[in-house]
A protein has these predicted regions:
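Left-handed beta-helix
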Residues: 1-15, 188-384
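Unchanged
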Residues: 1-241, 354, 359-361, 365, ...
């Protein structure tokens, strides 16, 4: 966005590590996780910085523009990635005139106006401000849970399932005062996970900002999504297809530029009989081709092809997958590059041997799951 940057603050984005979405073929770098067809977690993190008018430091920019900080070697958690990013920033950047650094972890989605968080950080004299994400009702997966006092001060950190008392999670997003960075790095040596935050709270003024109290220009509320399971990842994207999605992808006051790509626009064509393609309450990315067929309440990623006679309902179709003629799909996730054969039925009755039915009612179609039979009777991967 044009305009003067938020005074005294710079922001960096940190790559993430793989997690519960590995079955879907999501890259080991979770920052590249596709979302809403046209985005990656990485793009949405940079949109938060840009819309908040937070500049990125010169050390994290190149000819292509702002770049995310690579993760540390090995599979470090959120705290390890944040600490490595601060270590690199403090050793390779000039932070003269900068009082605060915002760190966003790109293994989830957080759309919040960082200017509001910065104001709270300053007004309460915080050294570190953690973005606390309210856990959606019914989610029980363990995560880093925060307990804060009435003054926002951090009281307790633990790796656990959410409770009625502690229902704010931390996914790796924070603001830190530059004066506190040396103490943050020194205090965290030899610690990992939740113990890092516990040590910091013993030595510094650490507060928690409940993002449910935050807002976005044009809509009045912040947005967050932490993909703790395949089911939560699916549900978040089905919500975006609804009439009142939690995140407005078309808010002119908070623009969300799509990931760069080289595909042409989507094309809704006719089938062999002249019947038009229909996509109702869908998110349709660049390069999608529908040759007739019908899609409802679904996300169609880049380069997806839907052949004539196919029907897709409540589905997540990831980049480059192919839905064959007359195939019927309901409540399915078709992973990137996968091929659903002509006439296949997914999510209706018997699950084909090349798909995986889950207890939640979802069906996954992924290359490593799909085994078909060739004409000579030998087993082969369909679409692999």
């Amino acid at each position: 966005m044009a305009g003067r940057g938020e005074r005294g603050m710079v922001g960096i984005v940190v790559h993430g590590s793989g997690g519960p979405l590995e079955l879907l073929g999501v890259p080991a770098d979770a920052a590249l996780t596709p979302f809403a067809g046209s985005y990656r977690f990485l793009d949405l993190a940079f949109a938060t910085l840009a819309n908040s008018r937070v500049r990125t430091p010169a050390a994290t920019r190149d000819a292509r523009g702002p770049q995310a900080v690579p993760p540390p070697h090995g599979r470090g958690g959120g705290a390890a990635r944040v600490l490595e990013a601060l270590r690199r920033l403090s050793s390779g950047s000039r932070l003269g005139g900068i009082t605060t650094v915002a760190v966003l972890s790109a293994d989830h989605v957080l759309q919040v106006d960082l200017r509001e968080v910065h104001t709270l950080h300053r007004d309460l004299g915080a050294d570190v401000t953690l973005a606390g994400l309210p856990v959606p009702f019914g989610e029980r997966e363990p995560r880093t849970m925060l307990l804060a006092g009435r003054d926002h001060g951090l009281i307790e950190v633990r790796r656990a399932a959410p409770t009625a008392v502690a229902n704010l999670s931390w996914a790796g997003d924070l603001l830190v005062s530059t004066r506190a960075i040396p103490t943050v790095l020194a205090s965290s040596r030899g610690a990992s996970g939740a113990s890092v935050l516990t040590r910091l709270a013993d030595r510094l003024r650490v507060i928690v900002h409940d993002v449910v109290d935050a807002s976005l220009p044009g809509v009045g509320h912040a947005y967050w999504h932490e993909p703790t399971s395949i089911e939560t990842y699916y549900a978040a994207q089905m919500d975006l297809c609804g009439q009142r999605p939690a995140l407005d992808l078309f808010n002119p006051a908070w623009p969300l530029p799509a990931a760069p790509g080289q595909l042409g626009p989507a094309r809704m064509g006719l089938d062999d009989g002249g019947h038009a393609a229909h996509a109702v309450s869908c998110l349709v990315a660049d390069g999608v081709v529908m040759r007739g067929g019908y899609a409802a309440t679904s996300v169609l990623g880049r380069g997806v092809v839907v052949e004539c006679g196919a029907e897709v309902e409540d589905c997540l179709l990831m980049d480059g997958c192919h839905i064959g003629r007359g195939a019927h799909l309901r409540r399915a996730i078709v992973t990137a590059g996968a091929v659903v054969p002509d006439g296949a039925e997914i999510g209706w009755s018997v699950t084909p041997e090349w798909a995986q039915a889950r207890a939640s009612g979802l069906t996954i179609v992924a290359p490593r799951l799909r085994l078909g039979t060739t004409e000579d009777g030998e087993s082969s991967a369909i679409g692999a």
